[in-house]
């Protein structure tokens, strides 16, 4: 993996912490599975590690059929406009809006299909995750799909040094994407805790 090669070449082969949301969380899981010493801490948010082929097929069908419309520049502008009106406190900064309008419409449908195939349809947690030395904070929203909640529980079963945190009232990735201060208040105590000692959800909330 290019990420692992980069860490070995530029970071002495180890990081203090790694993390990711959704598909990014799968990448973090994979790194932990490949190298038990890659990080002291890991934060995973709303990630699947149990394949969902049916959900993948539905998502791929919709993206293949409507992707060009859903991710056109006009649609992206409309989405940002609606966010400004409906959720003004959650609106993106101007710099992020510019990237959103520039990058998303250029994303090939083939790339989106590949992401859905990997994220939903194929990725399965490896047993080697049990050897990882990292302490993990696994966040998921209360309103997540059941398969995401099941993935979190499976991860904890295989890698016991894991804290599960259910973000009450929130959907997929909502806490990290839209409530940065609340996310920081949750994560900082976890990062400051002793990585060699198990702690409970109550210790970081």
Predicted regions and their residues:
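Flexible "cap/lid" loop of the alpha/beta hydrolase fold
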Residues: 33, 41-70
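Short beta-strand immediately N-terminal to the catalytic nucleophile in serine-hydrolase-like folds
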Residues: 18-20, 45
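Catalytic histidine-centered segment of alpha/beta-hydrolase-like enzymes
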Residues: 170-181
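Gly/Ala-rich beta-loop-alpha elbow adjacent to hydrolase catalytic centers
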Residues: 20-24, 28
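Conserved alpha/beta-hydrolase "acid-adjacent" motif
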Residues: 145-151
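Conserved acidic catalytic loop of the alpha/beta-hydrolase fold
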Residues: 1-15
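Short beta-strand/loop motif that positions the catalytic acidic residue
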Residues: 132, 138-140
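Conserved alpha/beta-hydrolase catalytic His-Asp/Glu region
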Residues: 53-55, 73-128
């Amino acid at each position: 993996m290019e990420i692992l090669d980069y860490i070995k070449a530029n970071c002495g082969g180890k990081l203090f912490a790694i993390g990711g949301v959704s598909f990014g969380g799968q990448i973090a899981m994979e790194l932990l599975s490949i190298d038990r010493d890659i990080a002291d801490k890991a934060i995973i948010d709303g990630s699947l590690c149990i394949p969902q082929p049916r959900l993948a097929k539905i998502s791929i069908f919709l993206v293949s059929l409507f992707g060009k419309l859903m991710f056109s520049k006009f649609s992206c502008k409309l989405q940002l406009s609606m966010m400004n009106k409906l959720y003004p406190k959650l609106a993106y900064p101007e710099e992020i809006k510019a990237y959103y309008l520039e990058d998303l419409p250029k994303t090939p449908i083939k790339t989106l299909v590949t992401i859905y195939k990997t994220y939903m349809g194929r990725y399965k947690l490896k047993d080697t995750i049990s050897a990882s030395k990292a302490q993990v904070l696994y966040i998921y929203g209360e309103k997540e799909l059941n398969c995401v909640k099941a993935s979190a529980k499976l991860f904890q079963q295989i890698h016991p040094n894991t804290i599960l945190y259910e973000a009450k009232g929130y959907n997929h990735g909502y806490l990290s994407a839209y409530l940065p201060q609340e996310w920081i208040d949750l994560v900082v105590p976890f990062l400051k805790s002793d990585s060699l000692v198990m702690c409970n959800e109550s210790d970081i909330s």
